[in-house]
C-alpha cells in the first residue's frame, strides 16, 4: 500500500502540472496573442492567470473583471490614484476619461520597456502619448486652463533635444511619471514653490546661482510674486535665448520679462520698489536702441545679471558702485571710474545730476 501511495503522488502532481500547462496554452485557442512578442515583453515570464484572475475555468464568462496592475505595482498604483489622473485626484472626470495603465504604456501583451524608443512612454514619444488627451483640438479637462501645451512643447528647446537623441526634458520629467498634480497643489513639481528644484534637476549650476539671488531667496521664503524659472522662460514653449519670440531674447527682456513686474504699480508699492526703473530705461539711449531692434545693446540682464541678480548694496552685485566699471566695461572697452558719475535710471525732468542729464540729452 505504501508503495502504491509513493507512486501515486508523483503521478498526480505530474498530471496537475500538465493540466495547468494545457490551461495556459489553451488561452491561445481563443485569444490571439503572439506568443513570441509576449515572451519578449517585460511581462513575458508571467502566466495568463496571474493577471486574468477568474479565467481558470475553461468556460469562463465573457467580460471578466478588468486586470488590476496594482496586484504587482502597488506603490505606483498608490501614487496614481491620488494624482490628477486618478479617481481621487480628478473628481470631476468620469472613469472613462481617466487614463489607464495600458492607455499610456500600450497593450500589455506587446508592451516594451520605457527605455526602448518603441515604448509609448519613452521620452521621444511622450508628447505623442500625452497629446492624445492634452493635444491640439482636445477639450481641456475642467479646471485646466493651459492652451495647447503639446503644441507649445513641440516647438521648445527641450523637445528639439529629445528629438535629436540628446537629454532633454519630456512631460514626465517636469510633471512626474505616475503622480502628476495640479500646479496649484503645493506638492506638485510645477507648483511655484517647487519649480526651481524641478528645473534644477537638470540645470544645476544655474539653479545654484538663482537660489542666491534676490528673486530666488524671495521665492524660497514663500513670496509668490517673485519670479521663478517659468515666469521668465515660459512653461512649455521654452525657446533658445537668441530665438525670435523668446521672452528672454535681448530685445524682449525689458518688455516681456522684467517690465511687467517692475512697472507694476501694485508690486512696486507692495515691496517698496522704485516706480521709474522701466520708463527711465525705455527713454535712455540703451532703451531706445533696444526698441529700435538693435540686438547688441545693454538690457536689464546686461547690467543686473541673469540668474545671479543681487541688490546694488551687495558687494557681489554687478551694479555695486565698485563693480560698475567692470560691468560697463563688458561693452565699453576701457571703462573706468568715470562710469560712476551718476545714476543710470534717470528721467529727463527729475535727474539732479547735471552731467548725467546732458549725457542723456546728447545721446538721445
Outline where the language-model segments fall.
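Positively charged n-region of N-terminal signal peptides that target proteins for export
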Residues: 1-5
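Bacterial N-terminal signal peptides
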Residues: 6-15
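Short sequence/structural segments immediately N-terminal
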Residues: 18-364
Amino acid at each position: 500500500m505504501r508503495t502504491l501511495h509513493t507512486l501515486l503522488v508523483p503521478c498526480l502532481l505530474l498530471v496537475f502540472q500538465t493540466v495547468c500547462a494545457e490551461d495556459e496554452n489553451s488561452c491561445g485557442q481563443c485569444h490571439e496573442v503572439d506568443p513570441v512578442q509576449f515572451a519578449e515583453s517585460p511581462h513575458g515570464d508571467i502566466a495568463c492567470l496571474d493577471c486574468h484572475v477568474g479565467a481558470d475555468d475553461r468556460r469562463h464568462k465573457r467580460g471578466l473583471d478588468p486586470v488590476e496592475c496594482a496586484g504587482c505595482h502597488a506603490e505606483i498604483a498608490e501614487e496614481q490614484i491620488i494624482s490628477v489622473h486618478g479617481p481621487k485626484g480628478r473628481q470631476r472626470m468620469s472613469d472613462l476619461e481617466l487614463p489607464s495603465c495600458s492607455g499610456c504604456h500600450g497593450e500589455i501583451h506587446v508592451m516594451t520597456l520605457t527605455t526602448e524608443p518603441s515604448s509609448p512612454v519613452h521620452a521621444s514619444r511622450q508628447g505623442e502619448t500625452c497629446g492624445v488627451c492634452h493635444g491640439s483640438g482636445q477639450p481641456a479637462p475642467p479646471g485646466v486652463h493651459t492652451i495647447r501645451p503639446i503644441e507649445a512643447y513641440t516647438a521648445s528647446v527641450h523637445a528639439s533635444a529629445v528629438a535629436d537623441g540628446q537629454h532633454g526634458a519630456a512631460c514626465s520629467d517636469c510633471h512626474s511619471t505616475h503622480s502628476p498634480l495640479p500646479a496649484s497643489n503645493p506638492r506638485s513639481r510645477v507648483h511655484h514653490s517647487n519649480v526651481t528644484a524641478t528645473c534644477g534637476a537638470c540645470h544645476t549650476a544655474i539653479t545654484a546661482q538663482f537660489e542666491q539671488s534676490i528673486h530666488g531667496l524671495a521665492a524660497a521664503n514663500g513670496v509668490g510674486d517673485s519670479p521663478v524659472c517659468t515666469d521668465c522662460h515660459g512653461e512649455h514653449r521654452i525657446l533658445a535665448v537668441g530665438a525670435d519670440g523668446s521672452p528672454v531674447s535681448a530685445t524682449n527682456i525689458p518688455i516681456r520679462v522684467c517690465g511687467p513686474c517692475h512697472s507694476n504699480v501694485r508690486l512696486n508699492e507692495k515691496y517698496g520698489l522704485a516706480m521709474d526703473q522701466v520708463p527711465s530705461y525705455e527713454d535712455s539711449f540703451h532703451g531706445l536702441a533696444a526698441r529700435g531692434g538693435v540686438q547688441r545693446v545693454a538690457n536689464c540682464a546686461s547690467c543686473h545679471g541673469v540668474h545671479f541678480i543681487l541688490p546694488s548694496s551687495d558687494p557681489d552685485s554687478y551694479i555695486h558702485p565698485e563693480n560698475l566699471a567692470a560691468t560697463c566695461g563688458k561693452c565699453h572697452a576701457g571703462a573706468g571710474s568715470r562710469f560712476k558719475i551718476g545714476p543710470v535710471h534717470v528721467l529727463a525732468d527729475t535727474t539732479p545730476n547735471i552731467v548725467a542729464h546732458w549725457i542723456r540729452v546728447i545721446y538721445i
